Regions:
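Flavin-dependent oxidoreductases
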Residues: 10, 42-44, 162-275, 282-294, ...
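Dinucleotide-binding Rossmann-like beta1-alpha1 core, especially the glycine-rich loop
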Residues: 40-112, 235-240, 246, 278, ...
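C-terminal catalytic lobe of FAD-dependent flavoproteins
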Residues: 235, 271-406
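Glycine-rich phosphate/pyrophosphate-binding beta-alpha loops
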Residues: 42, 48, 130-135, 237, ...
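Acidic, proline/glycine-enriched N-terminal capping motif
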Residues: 367-514, 519
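Flavin (FAD/FMN) cofactor-binding and adjacent substrate-gating region
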Residues: 65-66, 70, 79-149, 154-155, ...
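Conserved, structured C-terminal
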Residues: 395-423, 429, 441, 455, ...
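Glycine-rich FAD pyrophosphate-binding loop
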Residues: 16-36
Length: 788
């Protein structure tokens, strides 16, 4: 383990506990001399991520076992009506993942914490199991426990290099005090992690972002009791705990500072950076709005320290593709003490058994890609992620900083059509269109309409109708594309794909990539372009994830296989609807008839003389094609299709409408609807599994992904994660959500007990009220129901 903070100590402890006695924890200075030494030490279980919530719950159990945790409870205030709605939504999501929290009134909050004013207080979430600890005491206690189990802890050992074998796996660590052979290396080096990983030729992404907190003196007559609950006030951007009658106060600045984006000085240690009082003043003012007497409190010390932030504010936990034996527990993004205990346990499980009880996929270290090698761009994303750590971010809001980064060859045409651009993995891509209006970039748009029906709802309905009733067209160039070539390509894909891949050249296969236990690692299409050449197509945000996962599956005995991302090599135009064939037939002499161009095939055709690889697939449940074209010719291909489609009222659509279209047909979205903890039969995807290959996956399941119709025809603000109840008992949580414009229903997916079949009734907790819902067939829309 490299790094003597709470996470490194936790990994060392859990490996030693698992029986790995030859475990060594290395620290370049003294224990807790990195970000750990400046942490405030607050720990809450409240988090919308099932995995992080479980990390935090276990961390508290571990700290209690070590005798270092003060369980005083925690209050999260709502200082605005919108924040109260967010807390209501958060409480429902917490219940949906098994955390029992209580939403209480302003008066009840004041009874638990008499020091506050209830002015502008709309309520709070109360979590009695929350609390705080002393960072130094906790880390040293965990390191001592690791030593007791046989681990070694070596301070004043700075790592200077990582040796690899001829096959690229880890071999040894070089330090300024000598060499240590190791078959497994865990980088838990905080803000130095990217530099340490680079020693092994690995690329990871995190940026040091300044975080400030202060110790405030007790105010005479307003001394705070030592057992006062911890508090968090997102509207005022602050958190705190009592200490010596005063308070340790921290917060999240609206314009945070990123530093050392090209590399952190090795000699930086536990000393604070020069603090910035001017940047901290708004946080003091925010605290005084909830604790008026804090305006009189003197500052004992203001501390400024950089924390490692990733572009999505999620940690980096797991193996590093391409370097067997190298693991990460870094980029914790202010989840150090909350996540440290659980991260250490899960990573130790992964190292010793090859599996983790929890779904670590959201934290995979390889999810970022070449676009993030631009350190300034990565830093802007990290700064924005930090900004929204407390500041209310609505579900439909888009990133704003660091844009534009990547644009497709069709970007100017999208602008001319009035696109409202969102951002995904650096790509600018249309969310929806406003014909006749100037294009713009979406940002914090939902702040203007809150948790209500979006003002562009009717526009989405029109785009939806185009795909269902006429023909719609969309720029899908941001698709992730991976070329898999060589004599080892087919054996690799057959080993990891649920479906049968060995089909004729020109076949397109819809499949999931599966872990050995049947857990779903990806949801993709694979096109066979030649006997030893396959193209995998995935979502824009998953291309690096899928590429890295495939590299992790490669075995020493595999024949030569080359994996290469090709996302920028081709533009993609999607066109679907009842008249899609009519449009395509007008611009090509090739046979695109039902018999001449069957479903799930790929043909080379000419569109107005331009060479195009056409794939007859659909993600919207209508006839159509994905058209892969050289970016240099993409604009002309688009223009010809638009001209040919004019008589059918062809309409451009954005990515927002895809959820509505796909959910009416029962199509899934990876990450939201299924992941490593679900198998294809639970996800309703058993049709895509070759049972001869995967006989080990149990067909009989206890839960199943179901479609729900929630409420009546009127729009219901559901966003995913809300608790689903059956006779007052929580039985699941919502996954994907969308309004189905053809069927006029609020649709959502949820894993439910198999006893709840179509026709069954449940309830969904939506902003504090229970809304009736009906279990529907997977596809609520059949072809016969499509309105012409």
């Amino acid at each position: 383990m490299i790094g003597g903070g709470i996470t490194g100590a936790s990994v060392a402890y859990h490996l030693a506990k698992a029986g790995w006695r030859d475990t060594v924890l290395l620290e370049k200075d003294e224990l807790t001399s990195g970000s750990t030494c400046h942490a405030a030490g607050l720990v809450t279980q409240f988090n919308p991520s099932p995995t992080m919530m479980r990390f935090r719950r276990y961390s508290i159990e571990l700290y209690e076992e070590l005798g270092v945790f003060e369980k005083v409870g925690g209050l999260r205030f709502a200082s605005s009506g919108e924040q109260l709605k967010e807390l209501q939504r958060g409480a429902s999501r917490a219940r949906g993942i098994g955390l029992d929290v209580e939403l209480i009134s302003a008066d009840e909050s004041a009874r638990l914490m008499p020091a506050i004013t209830t002015r502008s207080l709309h309520g709070a979430v109360w979590v009695p199991g929350d609390g705080h600890l002393d960072p130094h005491t906790a880390t040293f206690a965990l390191a001592a426990a690791a030593r007791k189990l046989g681990a070694s802890v070596l301070t004043q050992h700075r790592v200077t290099g990582i040796e690899l074998t001829d096959r690229g796996s880890v071999k040894a660590i070089q330090t300024d005090a000598g060499r240590i052979e190791a078959e497994v290396i865990v980088i838990a080096g905080g803000i130095w992690a990217p530099q340490i990983a680079a020693m092994a030729g690995a690329f990871i992404v995190s940026t040091p972002v300044d975080h400030q907190h202060a110790a405030l003196l007790a105010v005479p007559g307003h001394e705070l009791p030592h057992d006062m609950p911890c508090f968090r006030d997102p509207d005022n951007l602050v958190y705190g705990k009592s200490e010596a009658g005063g308070v340790v106060l921290g917060g999240y600045e609206a314009d945070p500072v990123a530093r050392w984006i090209d590399g952190v000085p090795w000699d930086h240690a536990g000393t604070s950076l020069p603090p910035d009082q001017a940047r901290f003043e708004p946080l003091l003012a925010g605290a005084a709005r909830r604790f008026p007497f804090m305006g009189e409190a003197g500052i004992v010390k203001l501390v400024c320290h950089p924390d490692a932030m990733t572009p999505d504010s999620n940690p980096l936990v797991g193996p590093v593709p391409g370097v067997p034996g190298l693991y990460l527990a870094a980029g914790l993004s202010l989840n150090g003490f909350g996540g440290g205990g659980g991260i250490g346990r899960s990573l130790a499980e992964l190292i010793t058994t090859g599996e983790s009880e929890l779904d670590l996929y959201p934290y995979r270290p390889w999810r970022f890609g070449p676009v993030h090698r631009d350190f300034r761009y990565a830093a802007e994303l990290a700064r924005e992620a930090y900004r929204y750590y407390y500041y209310l971010r609505y579900p439909y809001d888009s990133d704003e900083w660091g844009r534009p980064k990547r644009t497709s060859a069709l970007h100017t045409r999208m602008q001319d059509l009035g696109a409202v651009f969102g951002a995904k993995h650096g790509w600018e891509r249309p969310d929806y269109f406003q014909p006749g209006r100037a294009w713009r970039r979406a940002g914090a748009d939902q702040r203007s309409f809150g948790f209500t029906r979006p003002p562009y709802f009717d526009r989405l309905a029109e785009e939806h109708r185009a795909f269902r009733e006429r023909v719609g067209i969309i720029d899908m160039s941001s698709f992730g594309k991976i070329e898999i070539t060589g004599p080892g390509a087919l054996p690799l894909l057959e080993r990891v794909a649920g479906n049968l891949i060995d089909r004729p050249v020109g076949s397109v296969v819809y499949t999931q990539l599966l872990e050995k236990n049947g857990g779903i690692a990806a949801d993709v299409t694979i096109t066979r372009l030649a006997s030893d050449h396959f193209r995998l197509v995935t979502g824009a945000g998953y291309v690096n994830s899928d590429l890295g996962w495939l590299r992790l599956q490669m075995q020493g005995g595999d024949r030569d296989v080359e994996l290469r991302e090709s996302s920028d090599d081709m533009s993609v135009i999607g066109m679907w609807g009842p008249h899609a064939r009519d449009v395509l037939a007008r611009v090509t002499d090739d046979d695109v008839s039902e018999d001449g161009f069957p479903f799930m095939e790929a043909h080379d055709i000419r569109v107005a003389g331009i060479r195009v690889l056409a794939q007859r697939v659909t993600y919207v449940g209508e006839l159509g094609w994905e058209l892969y074209v050289d970016p240099a010719w993409a604009g002309q291909a688009w223009d010809h299709l638009m001209a040919a489609g004019r008589e059918f009222d062809i309409t451009p659509g954005g990515y927002r409408v895809l959820d509505s279209l796909r959910m009416e047909k029962g199509y899934r979205y990876y990450g939201t609807d299924m992941g490593l903890l679900e198998n294809p039969f639970e996800a309703g995807l058993g049709f895509a599994v070759n049972r001869d290959k995967w006989a080990s996956i149990p067909r009989e399941v206890t839960r199943r992904l179901r479609t729900l119709a929630i409420g009546e025809e009127e729009y219901v603000p559901i966003y995913g994660g809300e608790a689903v109840l059956d006779r007052s008992r929580v039985v699941g949580r919502l996954r994907s959500c969308a309004y189905g414009f053809t069927v006029s229903k609020n649709l959502a997916y949820s894993y439910l007990p198999v006893q709840l079949k179509p026709g069954g009734e449940v309830q969904v907790e939506v902003f504090g009220r229970l809304v009736p819902a009906v279990v529907m067939p997977d596809a609520v829309l059949s072809k016969l129901e499509i309105k012409r």
